[in-house]
């Protein structure tokens, strides 16, 4: 086994990927997980390249005054590496990362950067994918004795232990143990977990219940790939167990009915691929379709389907976008004024009440690229909306949502956005919510050619958004912008920009 080297360095700043940046004695840049600016740390090098290295903190020699104890000390680097800083420091770093991205591309933002956060920093995730880990009982006992490690029960992540056996079954079994796990950042190993503090408590409870059920059946991790658990805002859960062998009875119907979930599936996933892709659905239990209401509009989605992970913050982004629909070319006051911030809305009933009072212009055409299941276009787009999405499963869910909403003027288009350019006519408001890679060059070229009056651009990567805006600003100006902390305790940022055609 190749030995990983240790280095002691000083950390200077947080960079776009979310790591802290330092410099090794040989001049190479070192991108470090688990450190904060101003700290001196000992790091373990996990990846080496000619001009840079990647590392994780092994020891903090001189801690930052901003450092706090992570909620999940053993696994936070796997899921949420910014658990080591207070929320106000996290918000400041995210503002700086947005500013750095636009400065890099010579784009001047017209107002101070504001990042909306509802201050719910844990328990917000409605979807978690767990890996699995097994080792022999003897090896586990020896390693725990050497390290002094004790088994941590379910109460670490939730006070609710209903339906969970708080006594480990592993000691009474021969053979392999079975544990939930996440991949350890910076290595090929795994870290055993009882859940994650980012998740809704119902997700952790269900994951542990499935683990305990499989322990009783003496299932080993080598037979399994992953466990996907998802819940709606009420805490009702569905699950998918991805297996490497065709084992349709690994969980029976009676056993599935005993779990704290409304439904679940056993999925055979080709073991030749590390990804949890659906090769064959082996067994189905109960109702596996979830329903959530977004700004008063109900949406149905599958366990494996695309849907927002943090719905309350997403609703705020939608409220902000709605203020820029429709576009009135004769008004100097279409949309909000720079520097004005909408009231923070936390109660979903209040959101629905406010939203239902906003008149929609049914004759204002809307084109929604990278539409997912249609949560943007179908909530803020009024009647005349075209939704373009590349994923066939998402389009099927979108079509079902359109039918159930009786949205007769909405059209779902299955196509990559770069192959649906004829829908850009220059008359519609264009909404884009692309993946991290940003807009396809052909989409940008067509926008500049057809010149729609307004572009609403929501991005999960400010760096590629800034790159795209730099190209579009030859014909467009930034009317408004705002950031959103969809994923607290992680480096991920969402940023909304409203682009209006120059006079």
Language model features: what each stretch is:
Residues 1-74, 146, 165, 175:
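Terminal RNA-binding accessory module
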Residues 2-10, 16, 216, 245-503:
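Rossmann-like S-adenosyl-L-methionine
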Residues 58-71, 76-138, 176-220:
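Extended interfacial segments that mediate partner engagement and assembly in macromolecular machines
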Residues 112-114, 222-232, 366-368:
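A short glycine-rich, hydrophobically flanked beta-strand micro-motif that places a catalytic Asp/Glu
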Residues 114-120, 226-230, 482-486:
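Short, solvent-exposed loop/turn elements at beta->coil junctions and helix N-caps
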Residues 137-176, 328-363:
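Intrinsic disorder/low-complexity segments
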Residues 189-225, 231-232, 245-260, 265-266, ...:
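Internal alpha/beta scaffold segment
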């Amino acid at each position: 086994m190749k030995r990983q080297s240790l280095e002691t360095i000083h950390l200077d700043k947080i960079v776009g990927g979310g790591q802290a940046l330092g410099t090794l004695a040989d001049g190479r840049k070192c991108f470090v997980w688990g450190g904060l600016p101003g700290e001196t740390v000992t790091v373990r090098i996990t990846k080496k390249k000619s001009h840079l290295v990647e590392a994780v903190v092994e020891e903090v020699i001189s801690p930052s005054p901003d450092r706090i104890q992570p909620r999940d000390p053993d696994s936070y680097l796997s899921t949420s590496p910014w658990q080591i800083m207070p929320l106000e420091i996290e918000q400041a770093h995210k503002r700086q990362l947005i500013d750095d991205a636009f400065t890099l591309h010579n784009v001047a933002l017209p107002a101070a950067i504001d990042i909306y956060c509802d201050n719910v920093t844990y328990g917000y995730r409605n979807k978690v994918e767990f890996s699995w880990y097994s080792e022999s009982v003897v090896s586990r006992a020896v390693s725990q004795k050497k390290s002094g490690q004790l088994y941590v029960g379910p109460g670490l992540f939730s006070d609710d232990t209903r339906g969970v056996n708080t006594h480990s079954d592993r000691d009474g079994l021969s053979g392999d143990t079975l544990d939930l796990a996440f991949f350890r950042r910076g290595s090929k190993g795994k870290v055993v977990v009882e859940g994650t503090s980012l998740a809704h408590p119902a997700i952790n409870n269900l994951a542990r219940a499935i683990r305990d059920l499989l322990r009783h059946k003496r299932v080993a991790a080598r037979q399994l790939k992953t466990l996907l658990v998802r819940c709606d805002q009420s805490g009702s859960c569905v699950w998918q167990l991805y297996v490497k062998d065709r084992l349709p009875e690994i969980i029976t119907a009676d056993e599935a009915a005993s779990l704290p979930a409304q439904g679940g599936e056993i999925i055979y996933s080709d073991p030749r691929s590390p990804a949890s892709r659906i090769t064959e659905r082996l067994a189905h239990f109960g109702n596996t379709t979830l329903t959530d209401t977004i700004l008063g509009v109900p949406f149905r989605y599958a366990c494996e389907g695309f849907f927002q992970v943090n719905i309350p913050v997403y609703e705020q982004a939608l409220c902000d976008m709605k203020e820029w629909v429709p576009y009135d070319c004769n008004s100097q006051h279409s949309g909000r004024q720079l520097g004005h911030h909408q009231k923070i809305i936390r109660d979903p009933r209040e959101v629905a009440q406010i939203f239902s009072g906003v008149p929609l212009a049914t004759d204002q055409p809307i084109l929604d690229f990278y539409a997912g299941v249609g949560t943007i276009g179908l909530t803020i787009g009024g009647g005349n909306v075209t939704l373009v999405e590349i994923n066939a499963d998402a389009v099927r869910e979108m079509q079902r949502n359109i039918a159930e909403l009786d949205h007769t003027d909405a059209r779902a288009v299955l196509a990559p956005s770069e192959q649906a350019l004829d829908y850009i006519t220059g008359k519609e408001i264009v909404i884009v919510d692309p993946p991290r890679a940003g807009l396809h060059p052909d989409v940008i070229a067509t926008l500049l050619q057809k010149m729609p009056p307004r572009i609403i651009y929501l991005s999960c990567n400010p760096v590629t958004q800034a790159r795209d805006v730099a190209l579009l600003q030859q014909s467009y100006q930034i009317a408004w912008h705002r950031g959103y902390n969809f994923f607290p305790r992680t480096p991920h940022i969402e940023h909304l920009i409203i682009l209006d055609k120059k006079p």
